Amino acid sequence: YDKYVVLLSNLQKLQNERNNLSKNIGIKKSSGEDASEEIKAVSELKTSINSLQDDSNSLEENIKTILEVIPNMPSDDTPEGKDEASNKVIKVHGDITSFSFSPLSHDKLGFNLGMMDFDKASEMSGARFVILKDKLALLERALSNFMLNIHTQKHGYTEISPPSLVRDSALFGTGQLPKFSDDLFQTTSGHWLIPTSEVPLTNIASNEIINKDLLPFRFTSLTSCFRSEAGSAGQDTKGMIRLHEFKKVELVSIVKPNDSSGEHERMLQCAEEILKQLELPYRVVILCTGDLGFSAAKTYDIEVWLPSQNKYREISSCSNCNAFQSKRMKARMRSSENNIESVHTLNGSGVAVGRALLAILENYQNKDGSIDIPTVLKPYMNNMDKIKLNE
């Protein structure tokens, strides 16, 4: 970088010198004087300027390449730590589900019901795919509609139906490219399948200058998400925890810089509301510096209790990215003083539909293998009380 600054300084000096000589040439020619020496000097300067310009362009590209893979700066209140072991539990909600029998895992429950088929999905698509049938397919749809209704009708989010295919620039803007290309699926035409609808929702503001009085923007969407899980070999190979394709309700906020901290807390509460209404036990964790995502300055994870694993598992991640994404995608706002500055962006799961479904299967299971329906979902499931074995 220091070399680049020196090059730019030298380049500017030569350009100024060339401009002054060019003025002198014009003056001499207008008065009939000989300007051959100045013309020769300008020609020599042009060669030097072109050489310096090439060098500075090359260094600028190198600097950009380096900057593209440098993550966001953690916020001051993000705890320090190397990995997830240093994450801090800040809230626990609800009592851990207790059973008078040994609870089954969601994949066994789904198989026994005849409504969850990993084998046929693997035959047609490969590992880490699932087919949901009958009442479990209905449960997935019920959860999706329930979440969208809560976020749009109660929390004030605007529902968006975005593309599932995006260009390089969209993924660069949100921070998935260039560093995490191995975790993405790319088409032969060069498009990418979205790993999360955070990508298209946040990019609604890309290359825009927004009137600050129109902010905040709050968007929600239900989409399929696609991830290659390249770095997850051997992890969660059974069940629905880690799939190549899964559905998720996403929350995205685009706000004024001074409002992002408060918006982050609000977004967390919106995601928590889903689990509270589903009456699922969960906890909230603040991620340490070593476990933060690439674009995040501060992240809360919500983890739902899974009886079969006897532990909490992530079901939502809510992140404040400050101006990191907006600077990459040129999302800006115009203030009342006509100043232009970057907006702040936030994103969160509201929540992962598949993980909510498996959490319901495990926490609402009965000894006979049937599944009780959470009260808030009954209107979305034809008012049935249970998903029964061999129904």
Task: Please report, for each region that a protein language model flagged, where it lies by residue.
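N-terminal alpha-helical targeting/anchoring segments
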Residues: Y1-T97, M115
